């Protein structure tokens, strides 16, 4: 039903993208089906759902973005991300992983509004280069065997850490996260939507691919990194005055929570991590879309100036509240279901983990509620274009589409 709703929107606004959507969707109805010879293979429902999410995000960008150059860059980036989800060996995975950086860099440098965009591009390139060269080191040390390997290989703990460093940068985990707020603040709205909704999923999907090589003995290191990212990142959100920076740090906390789910290495933890990927993809895309609409109308991203802004439109206020409540994991959103599964898994492993997760949830709910109350209370503006906000309706439906569970169970 949701797919038909979205396709009807595409048919109404951009008929050529309706054709593109239907052609791509016809490829996605097959599971365990290789339509690219030895190089591309659909081997999991998880990656099929991520590809569907990519197409939904592209759809809202196609409908809402007026700049044709940004549209072309968005289509290139989504195509690269789709190919990233379905390669059959590590070398192709790495190639498309690095290739995804260039459209975002062009968007930031070409269409950013402030001179600080050069500094944020330096951060992005430095982190990408610093964290990706170790991957090439492992590649050469393996005597090029990674070219033909279908993800199931046995390596030492040290080699796994080096291999996962490039994916950790795209998560990003807390200590490799400094490029993300800078890139979000300087990027145009379209680039921020793609960066939060798609590019962060490349790191999680890549880590999910190599997870079979993770040593069970050293999980404590990853659990510690995940908890530090959750707690410190959520406290960073509390002290932000820029709404876009707050949404960026919120992505850092959610990705740390996702890392906690992944390293448990159980079937239910994999299911919860994929659902959390989907929930964060839809939610963060809408967060940056709404913040971008606020910026385009008022000329500011400061939370102080958001006071009463969304109360000028009832539809906008409801949508804003729904998105940020979903971001904090309120039922019946997909975020709640995935986070509930993560909490259940962590309680089975150690009761003491619940204290850390409780702190994370309290702080996370606080900054989401603070942003909602600060934006809805007070005297409202009257110059807001409500029509554009209606484009986000399909993503809201997907964000609360709890029937994703039926795919896994």
Curated annotation (Swiss-Prot):
User: Catalysed reaction(s)?
Assistant: a ubiquinone + NADH + 5 H(+)(in) = a ubiquinol + NAD(+) + 4 H(+)(out)
UniProt-listed Enzyme Commission number(s): 7.1.1.2
Q: Which GO terms describe its molecular function?
A: NADH dehydrogenase (ubiquinone) activity; ubiquinone binding
User: In the UniProt annotation, what is the result of changing residue 51 to S?
Assistant: In strain: PB306
Its subcellular locations are:
Mitochondrion membrane
Sorted alphabetically, the keyword list is: Electron transport, Membrane, Mitochondrion, NAD, Respiratory chain, Translocase, Transmembrane, Transmembrane helix, Transport, Ubiquinone
User: What outcome follows a substitution of residue 11 to G?
Assistant: In strain: AB1
Tell me where it mainly resides. Answer: mitochondrion
Any one GO CC term of this protein is: mitochondrial membrane
Q: Which GO terms describe its biological process?
A: aerobic respiration; electron transport coupled proton transport; mitochondrial electron transport, NADH to ubiquinone
Recorded topology in the membrane: Multi-pass membrane protein
Pfam families in alphabetical order: Proton_antipo_M
- Stated consequence of mutating residue 317 to S: In strain: PB303
Which family would the database say this protein is a member of?
A: Belongs to the complex I subunit 4 family.
Report the protein's function.
Answer: Core subunit of the mitochondrial membrane respiratory chain NADH dehydrogenase (Complex I) that is believed to belong to the minimal assembly required for catalysis. Complex I functions in the transfer of electrons from NADH to the respiratory chain. The immediate electron acceptor for the enzyme is believed to be ubiquinone.
Q: What is this protein called?
A: NADH-ubiquinone oxidoreductase chain 4
User: Which organism encodes this protein?
Assistant: Caenorhabditis elegans
Whichever gene encodes this chain, its name is nduo-4
